[in-house]
């Protein structure tokens, strides 16, 4: 099973809490995290794109770097780990994204991939006068399908004459093409999002579900497998998971309860209000899941809490769910979290023994 890190390009990472570590994003911080992840054999690092935050007392995600330029910098200082940047497709034309991806591919020696998002939070785009209207919620995956068709043509052939509803290319050229295979990731969990991933993506992100219920995301994998059976393509699921691991289980649980006690209710309320705007995509979207009040303090991503042994065992359980290709991990304190995972959790995981062997061989 692959393991990646969802690096904190936005302030405070993925905890909407006054009691969680408070920090602003910087290149130096993300460089240190990514280099540490590479040291411990993590397979990839991915950064999101967020153009407007949720506010609240913690000013959650009000401070953000830009994904592609951050990953370009990280490409220059890493050597093995795969890097994924996120394209906000509403404001980044596919020909420009293809050229930026080719540039980062050159910097990294073929280690770059793209996470494609449609955009769900209207204020991110309306603040710039670039929101296309709320009808977009209903046809955003049709838009993304055309976008990706253009992108793939440019990345593989260096030229596109694509003609569609949203995009019309006129002998659009983009050379050189990348040296590496630029993998595509999508995080859609609605029916249309799943269909898109099955047709175009190499990986599909899904949310882990619940606290210490490692296999609870299995129904999402089942839907993806059904969609790929129709498309005839293999697409692996990558599961978003927060890890709170300590030597003693009670210490990890004490952290979790402390973070929940300091939940930033104003920021959580903003998330809920924004998720309610989309009335066209159905009830199974990622943003609906994120805004569920059950565990909104970390946007309801699957959470594994316990001793190093307990967390390792739960991650191995996740690897056994059919269709799982990997996990993408977040932490409360990323530098400390990656260190503890690499030193104490990963060595106990059956699903990561191949990585330990590779690390030993490289010493």
From Swiss-Prot:
User: EC number(s) on record?
Assistant: 1.14.99.46
Per its record, the protein catalyses:
uracil + FMNH2 + NADH + O2 = (Z)-3-ureidoacrylate + FMN + NAD(+) + H2O + H(+); thymine + FMNH2 + NADH + O2 = (Z)-2-methylureidoacrylate + FMN + NAD(+) + H2O + H(+)
Query: Which terms are listed as keywords in the entry?
Result: Flavoprotein, FMN, Monooxygenase, NADP, Oxidoreductase
Gene Ontology terms, MF aspect: alkanesulfonate monooxygenase activity; monooxygenase activity; uracil oxygenase activity
Question: Which annotated residues bind FMN?
Answer: 49-50, 115, 124, 140-141, 190
SUPFAM superfamilies from the xrefs?
Bacterial luciferase-like
The UniProt entry's sequence similarity note says: Belongs to the NtaA/SnaA/DszA monooxygenase family. RutA subfamily.
Q: What does this protein do?
A: The FMN-N(5)-oxide reacts spontaneously with NADH to produce FMN. Requires the flavin reductase RutF to regenerate FMN in vivo.
> What protein name does the entry list?
Pyrimidine monooxygenase RutA
What organism is this sequence from? Agrobacterium fabrum (strain C58 / ATCC 33970) (Agrobacterium tumefaciens (strain C58))
């Amino acid at each position: 099973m692959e393991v990646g890190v969802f690096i904190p390009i936005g302030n405070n990472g993925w905890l909407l809490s006054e009691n969680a570590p408070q920090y602003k994003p910087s290149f130096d911080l993300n460089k240190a995290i990514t280099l540490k992840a590479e040291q411990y054999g993590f397979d990839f690092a991915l950064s999101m794109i967020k153009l407007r935050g949720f506010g609240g007392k913690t000013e959650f995600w009000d401070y953000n770097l830009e994904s592609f330029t951050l990953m370009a910098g990280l490409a220059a200082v890493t050597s093995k780990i795969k890097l994924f940047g996120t394209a906000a497709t509403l404001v980044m034309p596919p020909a420009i994204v293809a050229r930026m991806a080719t540039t980062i591919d050159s910097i990294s020696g073929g280690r770059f991939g793209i996470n494609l998002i449609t955009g769900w939070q209207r204020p991110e785009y309306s603040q710039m006068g670039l929101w296309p209207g709320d009808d977009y919620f209903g046809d955003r995956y049709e838009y993304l399908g055309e976008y990706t068709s253009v992108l793939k043509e440019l990345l593989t052939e260096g030229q596109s004459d694509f003609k569609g509803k949203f995009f019309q290319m006129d002998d659009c050229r983009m050379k050189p093409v990348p040296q590496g295979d630029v993998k595509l990731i999508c995080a859609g969990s609605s029916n249309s999002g799943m269909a898109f991933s099955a047709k175009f993506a190499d990986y599909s992100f899904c949310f882990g579900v619940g606290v210490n219920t490692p296999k609870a995301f299995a129904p999402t994998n089942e839907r993806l497998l059904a969609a790929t059976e129709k498309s005839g393509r293999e697409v692996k699921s990558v599961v978003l998971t927060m890890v709170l691991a300590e030597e003693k289980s009670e210490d990890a649980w004490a952290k979790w309860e402390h973070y929940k006690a300091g939940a930033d209710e104003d920021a959580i309320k903003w998330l809920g209000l924004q998720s309610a705007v989309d009335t066209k995509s159905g009830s199974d979207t990622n943003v609906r899941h994120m805004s569920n009040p059950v565990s909104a303090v970390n946007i309801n991503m699957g959470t594994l809490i316990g001793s190093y042994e307990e967390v390792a065992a739960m991650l191995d359980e996740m690897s056994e769910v059919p269709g799982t290709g990997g996990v993408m991990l977040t932490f409360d304190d990323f530098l400390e979290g990656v260190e503890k995972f690499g030193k104490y959790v990963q060595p106990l995981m059956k699903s990561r023994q191949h990585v330990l062997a590779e690390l030993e061989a490289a010493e």
